[in-house]
């Protein structure tokens, strides 16, 4: 989408004011104008009006933003306008995502050594070749769906796995710093659904607005074969016994939906061990809040990084316990996949050597190897078809095929829904299933994150991936006046664009000008972050509903996401962020900033989304029974994080894997 010559001139001047030329190229020197035009043409045509507003504000500002006044004065005026500030941030993201800028900040993706990239081939079946009937249809191919599909296929049943997303190559997911789930640039990633075909509605402070997959509030994870496990950080934490009984341990705060799980840690422990062995977890050390594992982890931890060594010594001085972060990443060769190459592009990216365990290189190949599993991609389950007695008899499928809408109903004996905590309730609601007591979609939660950032006098970053290496679990529970708590760990190796965003958001470096550029050169390798998720107390008013007026490209009502963060969650976030700062200061940080408090007035939804189809023992207060079976529908199961009554103060994927193993085990033996 081409700009006018006048707009190009304004944009080039703005880019060079924001990131000027010194001993290194300016933003305009590295193609800022072409970058913005490419974004408007290929990524976000809906941004054209905002770019026009920003450039018009530049042209008409009085006193002028562009002109002879001192640069500092002009920068201050420039950032006072929200549209100009937004455009400047986008320009900075483009600049620091370009390999041209990386030597300037001392960043490289291969600090841990070179590697030979590989691809995992999967047999994706054309839609025209689908059978009329399968014993089981599994909807979603992520952690829950992929795991369930393997167990069910290996039991001798025929399985169809339906995935809305495509199967992009590893190379296509391994290196783009702008277009990945961790980028803040707002550009669609290859793991996103079609931005224009899948809107959602986000309600904030009572005001509804239509949002697209790259936007905040949409609640994106990853729409691709393998789901979020293609590009996740792979932290493999267990929930601990207290996590399964939060209401009993702490009581129920006013306005919250805090409740106990219908199963205990002891019931899930064998499946935790099975998941750790089956999918491959590396790590070491003991979490003080759960007993020793019944089976030792199959791989030792990855060697600690330089930041981890500093944090370990600091924790010892503070009297805190630490452990190696458990990871679904091979530290050595395991099950035919190599050990980690220690690259600096891990979370948000596909693993170039397939050392990171994902459904695409574990469960799905195993399921397909039975000869009983069929995988179809770029196809959406639009409705579950019911017959007598609440039994589901089939699944309606829909897709775009050669530019036309394709529809097909596949018959089945059983259905497993594992489409994520936004799309799973949406499918049930669109199907009229499971909502007799208005429970489907309620208790939506994810993870509020706590943390702090520190700057050190000397360089502390060695850029050795994945980066996350050491954690303290001392504060998961047992904190006076706090409900639950969380885990704190060092952070994944950040990209230069992420580093810019972290430092500017914290107010530790200027956003623009020569001072900003020089600070990026000096501080990028002197920065360390300690972060972690907190245990949310949930709310019945945080929920997924069907929007009454907005539909997707197939005419189906989209998800309407509303709700808020409970005040207790903000108290816990502040408590844990203070602990993160203490840790950094003890490690030698000379300047620190804690994470800003999360905005309370919108629902918690994101990569760790959970809770929207919680399991329980009473149909009046849950969507499924303790075995994941939807109340009133004996052959419909849920097998993703939607089931979680609470979501722990740690990354939830290992619990999703373990619970999916448990549910599929029950299904195959029922």
Where are these regions (language model features)?
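N-terminal Rossmann-like FAD-binding beta1-loop-alpha1 element of flavoenzymes
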Residues: 133-161
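Conserved N-terminal glycine-rich FAD pyrophosphate-binding loop of Rossmann-like flavoproteins
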Residues: 166-191, 222-235
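Conserved redox-cofactor binding core of oxidoreductases
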Residues: 185, 192-201, 211-215, 235, ...
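FAD cofactor-binding and catalytic pocket of flavoenzymes
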Residues: 1, 204-228, 232-233, 237-238, ...
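A glycine-rich dinucleotide-binding beta-alpha-beta segment and adjacent secondary-structure elements
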Residues: 324-328, 339-346, 382-385, 525-536, ...
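A conserved FAD-binding loop/helix module that cradles the flavin
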Residues: 646-665
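Mature-region segments of soluble proteins
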Residues: 2-17, 24-127
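Glycine-rich loop(s) and the adjacent beta-strand/alpha-helix scaffold that form part
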Residues: 151-154, 158-183, 370, 379, ...
């Amino acid at each position: 989408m081409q700009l006018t010559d006048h707009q190009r001139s304004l944009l080039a001047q703005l880019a060079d004011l924001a990131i000027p030329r010194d001993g290194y190229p300016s933003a305009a020197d590295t193609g800022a104008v072409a970058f913005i035009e490419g974004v408007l043409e290929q990524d976000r045509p809906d941004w054209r009006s905002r770019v026009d507003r920003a450039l018009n504000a530049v042209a008409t500002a009085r006193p002028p933003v562009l002109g002879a006044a001192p640069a500092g004065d002009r920068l201050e005026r420039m950032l006072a306008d929200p549209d100009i500030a937004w455009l400047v941030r986008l320009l900075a993201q483009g600049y620091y995502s370009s390999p041209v800028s990386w030597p300037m900040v001392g960043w490289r993706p291969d600090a841990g050594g070179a590697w030979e990239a590989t691809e995992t081939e999967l047999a994706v079946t054309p839609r025209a070749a689908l059978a009329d009937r399968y014993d089981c249809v599994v909807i979603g191919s992520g952690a829950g769906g992929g795991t369930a599909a393997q167990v069910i296929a290996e039991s001798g049943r025929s399985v169809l796995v339906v995935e809305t997303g495509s199967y992009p190559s590893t190379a296509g997911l391994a290196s783009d710093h702008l277009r990945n789930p961790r980028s803040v640039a707002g550009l669609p990633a290859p793991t996103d659904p079609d931005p224009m075909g899948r809107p959602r509605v986000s309600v904030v402070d009572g005001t509804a607005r239509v949002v697209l997959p790259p936007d905040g509030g949409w609640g994106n994870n990853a729409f691709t074969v393998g789901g979020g496990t293609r590009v996740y950080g792979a932290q493999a934490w267990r929930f601990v016994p207290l996590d399964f009984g939060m209401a009993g341990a702490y009581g129920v705060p006013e306005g919250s939906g805090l409740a106990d799980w219908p199963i205990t840690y002891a019931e899930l422990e064998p499946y935790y061990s099975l998941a750790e062995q089956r999918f491959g977890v590396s790590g070491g050390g003991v979490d003080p809040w759960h007993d020793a594992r019944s089976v030792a982890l199959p791989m030792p931890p990855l060697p600690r990084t330089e930041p981890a060594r500093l944090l370990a010594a600091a924790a010892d001085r503070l009297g805190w316990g630490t452990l190696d972060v458990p990871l679904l990443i091979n530290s050595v060769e395991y099950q035919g996949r190599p050990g980690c190459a220690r690259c600096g592009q891990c979370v948000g990216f596909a693993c170039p050597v397939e050392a990171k365990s994902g459904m695409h290189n574990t469960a799905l190949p195993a399921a397909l190897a039975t000869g009983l599993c069929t995988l179809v991609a770029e196809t959406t389950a639009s409705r579950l078809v019911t017959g007598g007695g609440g039994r589901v008899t089939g699944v309606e499928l829909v897709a775009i095929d050669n530019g036309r809408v394709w529809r097909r109903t596949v018959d089945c004996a059983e259905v497993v829904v594992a489409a994520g905590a936004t799309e799973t309730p949406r499918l049930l609601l669109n199907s009229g299933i499971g909502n007799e007591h208005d429970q489907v979609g309620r208790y939506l939660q994810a993870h509020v994150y706590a943390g702090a950032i520190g700057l050190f006098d000397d360089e502390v970053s060695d850029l050795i991936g994945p980066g996350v290496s050491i954690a303290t679990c001392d504060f998961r529970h047992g904190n006076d006046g706090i409900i639950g708590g969380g885990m704190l760990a060092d952070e994944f190796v950040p990209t230069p664009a992420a580093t810019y965003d972290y430092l500017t958001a914290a107010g530790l470096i200027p956003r623009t000008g020569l001072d900003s550029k020089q600070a990026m050169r000096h501080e990028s390798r002197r920065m360390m972050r300690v972060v972690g998720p907190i245990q949310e107390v949930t709310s019945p008013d945080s929920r997924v509903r069907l929007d009454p007026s907005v539909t997707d490209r197939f005419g189906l009502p989209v998800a309407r996401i509303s709700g808020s963060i409970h005040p207790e969650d903000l108290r816990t976030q502040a408590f844990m962020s203070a602990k993160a700062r203490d840790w950094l200061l003890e490690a030698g940080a000379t300047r620190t900033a804690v994470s800003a408090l999360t905005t309370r007035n919108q629902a918690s939804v994101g990569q760790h989304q959970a809770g929207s189809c919680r399991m329980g023992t009473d149909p009046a207060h849950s969507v499924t029974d303790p075995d994941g079976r939807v109340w009133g529908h004996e052959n419909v199961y849920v097998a993703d994080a939607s089931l979680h009554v609470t979501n722990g103060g740690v990354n939830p994927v290992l619990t999703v894997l373990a619970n999916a193993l448990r549910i599929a085990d029950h299904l195959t033996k029922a």
